[in-house]
Curated annotation (Swiss-Prot):
InterPro entries: GrpE, GrpE_coiled_coil, GrpE_head. Belongs to the GrpE family. This is Protein GrpE. Homodimer. The keyword Hydrolase does not apply. It comes from Brucella suis (strain ATCC 23445 / NCTC 10510). Residues 1-24, 209-230 are annotated as: Disordered. It is found in: Cytoplasm.
Length: 230
């Protein structure tokens, strides 16, 4: 098969006489044409092999680039998620800074308010009735106390009103217990010192007295149950 492929395909050449100059020239021309054709075929085969190799190389490069692209997308999504979390965290920190910036100052002002209230409570009622100047002074101190608390309220400080509510250790500090069979256990029955909150945080817990001996509160639905059924 290889010999047939490498042999010129013109049957007339077999009839040529190599000793005849014309035939010899024809044979030479045929051989040249055959060699040119074989060279062209060889170049075409080499080009085809090279092209096939380039296709394989291109396919490999595409696969590598697709893998790199997938990895870059994952990295981009992670970075975007981290940036979003950072933005939310920063926004929350800024909001907290604005809401709670006066926390320490407000706590100090509550001590001043407590002193004003103690001064007012220390004045006997009959002394106020007997001395108009003392009464005017007392009213002035009371107005100062109210103005201070209103100013704090404008900045997010609110007074807790726990009396009659269920004791909450996050906002209340129990100082004593009061026996009362008519109220559910751990109901705030008396406020010894007012408590305050700033935003959602406790600024100062309310010092309270709580009831004991009454029906317990069910943890499931908040309904009261008697001591005997507990």
């Amino acid at each position: 098969m290889a010999d047939e492929k490498n042999k010129p395909e013109n049957p007339d050449l077999d009839q040529r006489d190599i000793n005849n100059p014309r035939d010899r020239e024809a044979l030479k021309q045929a051989a040249d044409n055959f060699l040119k054709a074989r060279r062209a075929e060889a170049r075409a085969e080499a080009a085809a092999d090279e092209a096939e190799g380039e296709v394989d190389e291109t396919a490999n490069r595409i696969a590598v680039l697709e893998a790199d692209n997938t990895e870059l997308k994952d990295q981009m999504l992670r970075v975007a998620a981290e940036m979003e979390n950072l933005r939310k965290r920063t926004q929350r920190d800024v909001q907290d800074a604005r809401a709670y910036a006066i926390t320490n100052f407000a706590r100090d002002m509550l001590s001043v308010s407590d002193n004003l209230r103690r001064a007012l409570d220390a004045i006997p009622a009959d002394a106020l009735e007997a001395d108009s100047n003392l009464k005017s002074l007392s009213e002035g101190v009371e107005m100062t106390e109210r103005a201070m608390l209103l100013a704090l309220e404008r900045h997010g400080v609110k007074k807790l009103e726990p009396e009659g509510q269920k004791f909450d250790p996050n906002f209340h500090q129990a100082m004593f217990e009061v026996p009362n069979p008519d109220l559910p256990n751990n109901t705030v029955v008396q406020v010894v010192q007012a408590g305050y909150a700033i935003g959602d945080r406790v600024l100062r817990p309310a010092m309270v007295g709580v009831s004991k001996g009454g029906p317990k509160v069910s943890a499931e639905n908040g309904a009261s149950t008697s001591e005997d059924n507990a």
